[in-house]
């Protein structure tokens, strides 16, 4: 919103402050509380590193929101976090570690701030419901039905060809050698798993083994009622034949099997008391590495940026493949476009993408599947109608509204 009132007394009705005034207020509040907080207490609570990380976010995005570069301050705060000034953290050697934190007593040292989840007490039900099909309960071993609402934007058109949009194709932006680019499956009785995506033909959970799948296919309930449920990396009315394809590929023309499903935050077997028991990370040390890398990249230190990115990325590749994908070993690959792609890969599903694209001038201006460049600036939310009615001192400050 940018232009919001700064209210410190609930009885006050105040007009909007400038973006710079809002920024300065937020910064001063965070800096004031920082030394009074404990260290390494980031399970459902903000500690010193959590507040320092919010300051990193504030400084990293300052130039876009207030027109004043704060990359030097961002670099200093990020480096202090990496140096352990605000607590001891480290990159998890296992790519799944930050997202299964809380399972069987495990706590990932990468997570600076995570929201603890526990079934029947504090659940992330919306996160499951948004991505999961009604029938996924039979493959994932739980009794939830899901809304079948969300999926990855498609990488392929109606005829299986890759789209060419720079900012699209989230699944295919992962190299085939990246070990995250696998179909999700539980691989042990302890809830170990692999892969970040539900894709292709879906099979029933193997209750006899306690993990994995049987050979029994799960069937659809709508367009593919009684037929195998096969997730495709496309959007279109395929069930209607040529008539359906003629409608094109748009948001309104999805089917029940449309799109690969992100399962980065794993839904583990309910029969093992693991379902809805893993935390949801809000801030990972990886974000601090990437923020510091971006500061160095913007200042011209590409090698320094590459080393920081590689420190996180190395866990995604087998040793024999790493030299081909290391930025330090292939520095010419680290361009603006590649940096934006890498942010998308690392933080897919973690609610970073919009603000990252805005910071890199690719949100309103950018194009991807079913989204053309916007004629008006969509970077800033409009002041809500209800807020305008409730406070006569507020003005609509967002252009185009």
Model-identified regions with their sequence ranges:
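Short linear capping/connector segments at secondary-structure termini
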Residues: 8-13, 324-328
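Long, intrinsically disordered, low-complexity segments
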Residues: 25, 98-168, 272-285, 296, ...
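A conserved hydrophobic secondary-structure block that centers on an alpha-helix together
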Residues: 12, 40-41
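An aromatic- and glycine-enriched ligand-binding surface/loop that stacks and positions planar moieties
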Residues: 31, 45, 49, 54-232
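Acidic/His metal-coordination segments adjacent to aromatic residues that form catalytic metal sites
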Residues: 10-20, 266-274
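Extended, hydrophobic/aromatic-rich amphipathic alpha-helical segments that build helical scaffolds
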Residues: 1-6, 19-37, 44-82, 113, ...
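C-terminal substrate/ligand-recognition segments
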Residues: 187, 191-314
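Flexible glycine/proline-enriched surface loops and loop-helix/loop-strand junctions
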Residues: 38-39, 61, 270-274
């Amino acid at each position: 919103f940018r232009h919001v009132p700064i209210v410190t007394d609930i009885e006050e009705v105040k007009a909007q402050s400038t973006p710079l005034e809002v920024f300065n207020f937020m910064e001063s509040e965070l800096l004031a509380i920082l030394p009074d907080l404990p260290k390494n207490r980031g399970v459902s609570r903000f500690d010193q590193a959590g507040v320092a990380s919010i300051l990193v976010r504030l400084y990293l995005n300052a130039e876009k929101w207030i027109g004043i570069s704060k990359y030097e301050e961002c670099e200093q705060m990020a480096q202090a976090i990496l140096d352990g000034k605000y607590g001891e953290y480290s990159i998890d050697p296992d790519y799944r570690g930050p997202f299964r934190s809380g399972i069987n007593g495990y706590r990932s040292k990468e997570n600076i701030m995570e929201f603890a989840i526990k079934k029947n007490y504090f659940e992330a039900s919306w996160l499951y419901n948004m991505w999961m099909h009604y029938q996924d309960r039979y493959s994932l071993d739980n009794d939830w039905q899901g809304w079948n609402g969300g999926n990855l934007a498609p990488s392929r058109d109606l005829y299986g060809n890759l789209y060419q949009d720079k900012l699209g194709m989230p699944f295919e932006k992962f190299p085939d050698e990246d070990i995250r680019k696998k179909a999700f499956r539980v691989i042990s009785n302890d809830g170990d798993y692999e892969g970040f995506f539900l894709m292709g033909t879906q099979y029933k959970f193997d209750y006899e083994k306690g993990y994995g799948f049987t050979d029994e296919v799960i069937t659809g309930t709508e367009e593919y009622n009684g037929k195998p449920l096969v997730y495709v990396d496309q959007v279109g009315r395929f069930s209607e034949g040529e008539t359906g394809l003629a409608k094109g590929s748009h948001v309104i023309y999805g089917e029940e099997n449309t799109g690969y499903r992100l399962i980065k935050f794993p839904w583990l077997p309910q029969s093992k008391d693991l379902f809805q028991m893993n935390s949801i990370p809000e801030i990972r040390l990886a974000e601090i590495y990437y923020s510091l890398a971006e500061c160095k990249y913007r200042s011209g230190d590409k090698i320094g940026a590459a080393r920081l990115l590689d420190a996180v990325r190395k866990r995604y590749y087998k040793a024999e493949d790493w030299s081909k994908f290391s930025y330090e070993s292939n520095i010419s690959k680290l361009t603006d476009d590649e940096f934006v792609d890498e942010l998308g890969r690392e933080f897919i599903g973690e609610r970073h993408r919009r603000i990252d694209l805005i910071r890199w001038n690719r949100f309103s201006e950018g194009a991807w599947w079913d989204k053309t460049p916007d004629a008006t600036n969509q970077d800033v939310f409009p002041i809500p109608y209800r807020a305008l009615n409730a406070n006569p001192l507020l003005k609509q400050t967002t252009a185009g509204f």
